[in-house]
Every structure is written in structure tokens, then in C-alpha cells.
Amino acid sequence: MIMNLVTNSHILSRRFSSIVALLLMILVDTGCAERQVPSAIALSGSVSSSDESIMEGVVVILQPLNSPVLIAVTSDAAGQFQFNRDRLAAGEYRVSVRAAGYELQGAKTVVIGETQSQRLGELYLTAVTDPLRLASQLTSLDWVNSFPGSEAQKDLLVKNMVNCGFCHSLERVARSGYTAESLVKVIQRMHTYETDHASADRIQVVSKPKPIEGLHWYGRKASDIAEYLATVNLSDGKSQWDYPLKTLPRPFGEGTNATVTVYPIPRQPSVIHDLDVDSKGNVWYGNTGWDFIGKLDPRTGEFSEWSTPNFLPEPEEGLMRIVGVQDIQVDETDTVWVAVMGNKHASFSPDTETWQTYDLPVIWKNPFLGPVRVGEDGLWATGITSMPDGPIRHEHAFRFDIKTGEVGSGIMLFDDKPFPTDPKRVDQLNYCYMMDQDAQGNFLCTAPEASSIARSDREGNVRLVPTPTPNAYPRRGYRDDNNHFWFTEFFADNVASIDLDTDKITEYQLQPRYISPYYARPDSTGKIWISSTGSDRLLRLDPETGKVVKYLMPVEYDARKVVVDNSADRITVWLPNKNQGQLIRVEVTN
């Protein structure tokens, strides 16, 4: 009745409205449970240690006792942390922390109520002094910084198309006892794995071992890499490392203002290379370790999955047929475009749960797809049209009309272009990695070994725009609303943009060395989000000031893509955690 009176208060006198308001106040004061307003803060606390009375940048992690999902926040400059109620359901949670060099003593749990704010109190951390225990807390970048050796030696380890950290942490390398001779054999074995579709827990053996003599790892001498690794691991009977273990600084300032939620997918072990978000906020991902796509509804935490077609031929005896999906792109109708294996395009309709496939005039298709934004109807992809002639691969770009299903004429990309000339590598090739389109719908892609952005008009006039930094290895990125394509320079530790109206490239230096940026994605405010391979940090660049904010994830992560959820009510970024089979949501809270 009271709600009805209030709703129709425009026909009541002011005096009677005042009486209604007074009645409402009395009801609230009586403490009726059904009318209690839940506190916006579900849990708060502080962090300190024997070394620091106030600890900023400690990642505090909660995990429900009945769920694998992780929810994490980071302590601020006052050592305080808080979890908002809209991200914590009532129930019991395990409490853990991430702060290299420190640990939380004993098991700790907390019960979150339905309405009242809970104060966890002080989390008191103790310093880790045992190097063997500290080693398990280091990121791969921490290991690179700790390893002795010259810049050239560390470049051997990190600056490769595929490096050790792409499938597992460098802790595994550092703890190994392999000699240089044995490590060459390890590299030989790992060369038989399909790197994008594999992790340490999900391995696909797709090629036969190459001869040890003259073995290279993506253009580098395998023997040089092995000899260096044998100087930093536990070979020769060592029980501890003969160098100090170094850790990166903890997050600070704006880097503490995020809530991170980690969703392990149900099918494990899996590999998640790419994802995208539809107009409703659902997260679609390709399972790169198996022939499945999946969907997460973040509102309910519910997962769904569907099997995918695979058009690769059967392999020769003793080898595995590559399975798994890489790129995912969702168009404005929420149709899901999927980079299935083989030489075809494939789309999935969420409404009918059916697949449609389209032929492409290629014998091999690049496992990435160009984005299709609202108002765009061209899906760009590349593929090899005939058997390569040595290093000439006959890679062509094709525009696919997602509305009509028509495939445009192929654009020859590199056959008449000079070969890359990085003096530190052999057997270099011209090829496209990540493709996109300019505001007019014309093709572009990153050409990593040519250290260029390849561009073409509809008539097939191709030009290479070189990066200002030579041999920078441009990797993946995305075009913003101002017709600038943002991309990472993996070897140069830069993020860059090319003005697609003028071809001018602007570079922004990232720190520290070997931060290894992989994917760059602009958000609606003009900030650029960058995934980093090996640091477990997500970066945010402000191009106007050059300021970079770093957010530490609660888990080891390797994200090959960054997606901004434009349907969310706050800046929200999604990451596919390749090697752990997880989806990570990062929400900026301030």
C-alpha cells in the first residue's frame, strides 16, 4: 500500500506525502530485515608485514569453497583493500595473496553475509627468505631479470617468434638440471609441438624431430640458446642458484584500482588463445586445444560449449592432427566467426546453434580473422593459395562479405617484396600475423619479420610501412575510432600506432626491457590496453601523457588478445589466459 501511495503521490497533498515519508522512516528504523539495504562493500581489510607497516600493491584473492572462480583486488597506498558486494555472493571463501617475497601464514577463510559489510582485519605477511620457495613466486620476467648474462644472451631467450614462456613459466627452465647437450634435445623435442595449440599440460605433436646438427629455434641457433640456459639452471649438480632472485615492483597508484575475476573453463586441460564479447556481454572463446568453442555468461557464471568443424587432412602416421580454434570475432548481429582449422571460413549462430561454412581459394588459411565492427560487413583473412616456392609463400588476402557470403579477389601480399634482413636470425619470411581494416574497409596486417604494417587498397596495390624501430616485430592490435591502428612491437618493447590517413607511425616505449607486449586494444576513453607476455601484468597506456599503469593479475597469465567490453557500465577488459585455460575479467573500479 505504501508503495502505491508513493507511486501516486502526484495526486496527493504535500501534507499526506509527508506522512507517508514519515511512515517509511519509521519502518526503516524498526530494522525490518526485508527492508535492509545491503552495504555496497562486502569485505574490507588491510595488509602489513614485518618489513612494511603499510603494504601497497598486494593482490588479495578470494575463492568460494564450492567454486574454482577467483575474485581479486589490490591493496592501495594506505594498505587497505575492499571487495564490492556486486562481485561477491554470500558464502565462505578461502583467502590468499600474491606479493612476491611474502606469504600469508596458514589457511584463512572468511564468511560473507547477505547484507552487512565484513571487516577481515589485518592480513599480516611474512617475508620469504628461502630462494627455493621464493622461486615459485617469480614471473618469467622476474627470471629474465634475475638471470646473469649479456643483453645478447637474454635476447636469444626472449626475442623469438615463440619463446620458452609461451607454453610454460621460465621457472621450469630455471629448476631443470639439463646440460647444454641435453637442452638441445629438449629444444628438438619442443620443435615437434604445435605451439599455439599447446601448453605444458596440453601437448599436440604435429611434426617429426628435426636433425640435431644445425638445429635452429625460430631463426636462432639452438646450441646457443642451450648453452646459455645451462648457465642459469641447476645443472652440474647445483642445489641452488648462484645469483640473487629479483622481483618486479608491486602495483601502485592507479594500478591498485581494479577488480579481477578469473573463470577457469570446465574442459581441462585446455588452451585459450582468443575470445570476443557479444552485444549482451557474453564472452565467446575458442578452445585452442580442442575442437570446441565456448560461451561464458558472466552474469550467472554459466558455461556452454559446442563442437567445431575441422577441415585439416589426416596427418601422417605417428603425428597428431592439429585440433582447436584460434581467433573468434563477433559481428553486430552476434554471429560468431570462428577461425577453424583448415581452409574454410566458419560462422556459428547462437540462436539456432548451427554452423555455416564457406570455401576459400586457399590451401592453408591464417588462423586469425580481421575484426568486424558495427557497420562493417567485410571480414578479412589471409591464406596460401599454392605450394610455396622456397621462402615465397604466395600469401593472399581475401575480403569476405559476411552478408552475402561472397569472397573477393585475392590480393597478393609479399611475392614481389624484399625479404626481411634481421642480421640476428636466419630463414626469415614475409607473412601476415594480425589483420584489420582501415575506416574505408581496406586491408592491413602486421608483418612481423618485415617489421612493417602491410596495407592494400581494393585494387591490390600493396605497400609496406616500416616501423621506425628496425626489427621491432609488430604483433597484434586493433584500429580505433580515429582511424589509427594500435599494435605492439614485441621485440622492441613498444606499443605503436599508425595513422591510416598518413601512414605515420608513433611509438611509445614500455618498461622494463623484455616486458614483451603482445596485443594492443584501445578503449572508449582513448586509453590503450596491452597484454604482456611473461610479467603477469596488464598495461594501460595514456597516449596523451605517455603514462603507463600496470595491473598485476592474481594468476600466471599469457594473453594473446585483449577485448574491451563496450556493453559494460565500467571500463571492462577480457583476457584469454592461454596456458591455464582461463578467462580473465579486469574491471577498473576507480
Positions of PLM-derived features:
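The canonical Cys-X-X-Cys-His
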Residues: 160-171
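Beta-rich, blade/repeat-based domains predominating
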Residues: 268-278, 312-331, 363-376, 418-439, ...
